[in-house]
Amino acid sequence: MQDSSKNKQPCVSWKVSPLKAKAMSPDDVSRLFCKSSTSSATRKHDPFHKLWDRLQPKAQSTIQRTSSLPVPSSSNFKERLNNIGGLKRSRTLESSYEDETETANKLSRVSSLVSVIRQTIDRKKSLERRVREEQEEKTDNEDDNDVEISTQESLENNGLAEKKDDTSSLATLEDDIEGQEFSFDDQDLQMLQDIEDQWLSSQKQQGSPLTSDHISK
């Protein structure tokens, strides 16, 4: 009865006396960690067999814990993948939209700069042409003795009025470009125009819809 009650215990303690331990051979020591080949009915008090019985439940419990680890279901895994893919697509669309907006802003700034420079050059050319024509007209009027004085005064008054307007326009233009150490001419305008045309042609080859309005203009 005592043996059966001891066998039901989950862990069995066993001891080897110091004298017996000294007398044990290396083979006997190695058999402490091997399952006994003898039957438990014939050798109930075999410490080697009891050691194996004590270690066996621990191995089984370890296997059970390993096999009982939670595994995510396939539906949740697919849902997470879809969410990640949707997030990546939204970020891609957002970044592409920002790139298109930035490209449109750059094109608008380049076009505005070309327009301003073109208007500035046209104003300067027109002013120079007016001054030159007035000087030539004034010289011709001074050399021509047959011209009446009233006509001469009328032309001079008109010339002074136009010159005053041109002078005010030139002063306004100088105020706009005050502090700048450079000036624009036809060559600068042509260079900017080439840059704009090259950019538009490259965007058109790429099929960008942003250049349709600018190309149509």
Swiss-Prot record:
One of its GO terms (cellular component) is site of double-strand break. The modification Phosphothreonine is found at T92. Residues 136-147, 173-188 have a biased composition (Acidic residues). The modification Phosphoserine is found at S68. Residues 59-76, 148-157, 199-217 have a biased composition (Polar residues). Keywords: Phosphoprotein. Residues 59-105, 124-217 are annotated as: Disordered. Residues 124-135 have a biased composition (Basic and acidic residues). This is Uncharacterized protein C2H8.05c. It comes from Schizosaccharomyces pombe (strain 972 / ATCC 24843) (Fission yeast).
